[in-house]
A protein has these predicted regions:
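Feature captures the catalytic ectodomains and active-site-proximal regions of enzymes
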Residues: 1-278
Length: 278
């Protein structure tokens, strides 16, 4: 495989926050260096179900992760497995649930917090965090600076064809403070600046890049339901290909086949939604 793509998941960022607070991302759109669409998540718009849908291309009622209490190995074809089947190298810098969904479960911290498994059929290079002890007061989230540096290190050291970064910082901020507040303004600005620091380097390394979220949140910081604020996110695309009209509403289930299409990996029959990039 000679193509490369990175998926950056900023957990819990609603569409409105992307478009009003991420000035660096929006500046790239204005300059023509990126494109942006609105994307709607599956329901329930909870983290676990959305993670599984992002990588399998099917709704929770099919893949079986119906809530954040259903953490198990998903038994359907997924992005990691398809990239590996096509000869690509995969990496993940994410919450530990991604490892449980797509490599092995249950997550054993000493064994699974960090691994390099060149022969794995799914994730070759994993760097994970559990957020154990998380509550309303203590977010237990790792520094985004460390996550971004770690993904870049994996790209340089192992030549990833597909890599994913997932950060829960803004999701946790939203649960604690809501969205109409100075804390959220500042948090979005910091992550936007982090993207500005790393994204040009990824592009220079030959990566196409997707920046998006798994789900949104209500103004009070809730998600899981059906409201547009809880489901709708922005998707920014840094790469080639023909995309849909700017006003098109993307389906989250089309993300997995789109990633595979860009990488030249086979799209399994279980992924029934057409790629939105040609």
């Amino acid at each position: 495989m000679d193509r490369k793509l990175l998926l950056i998941i900023l957990d819990g960022v609603p569409h409105a926050n992307f478009r009003r607070y991420f000035g660096c991302l929006e500046g790239w759109v204005a300059s023509g260096a990126a494109r942006v669409w609105r994307m709607r998540s599956v329901i329930p718009s909870m983290s676990g179900p959305c993670y599984a849908s992002i990588h399998t291309g099917v709704e929770p009622q099919v893949h079986g992760v119906l809530s954040n209490a259903h953490i198990c190995r998903v038994g359907l074809p997924d992005v990691f497995a398809q990239v590996r089947a096509a000869g690509g190298v995969t990496g993940a810098v994410t919450h530990s649930w991604w490892s449980e969904f797509f490599n092995r479960a249950p997550f054993e911290p000493v064994r699974d917090i960090e691994y390099d498994e060149p022969d794995s059929a799914t994730i070759n290079h994993g760097r994970f965090h559990t957020m154990s002890g998380y509550d309303h007061v203590n977010q237990m989230t790792p520094s985004d600076a460390d996550l971004f540096a770690t993904l870049t290190m994996l790209c340089r050291r192992f030549g990833l064809n597909y890599g994913i970064l997932h950060t829960c910082t803004l999701d946790s901020l939203g649960h604690r403070f809501g969205h109409d507040c100075a804390q959220m303004d500042h948090g979005c600005a910091l992550l936007d600046a982090m993207l500005a620091l790393y994204l040009p380097g990824w592009r220079e390394m030959g990566y196409e890049v997707i920046v998006t979220a798994d789900h949104g949140q209500s103004l009070r910081g809730h998600h899981g339901g059906t409201e547009d604020t809880q489901r709708d996110v922005a998707l920014y695309w840094f790469g080639g290909g023909e995309g849909p009209a700017p006003a098109t509403l993307l389906d989250q289930r089309a993300l997995a086949p789109t990633i595979l299409s860009r990488l030249g990996a086979p799209i399994p029959a279980t992924m029934r939604h057409a790629p939105f990039l040609a």
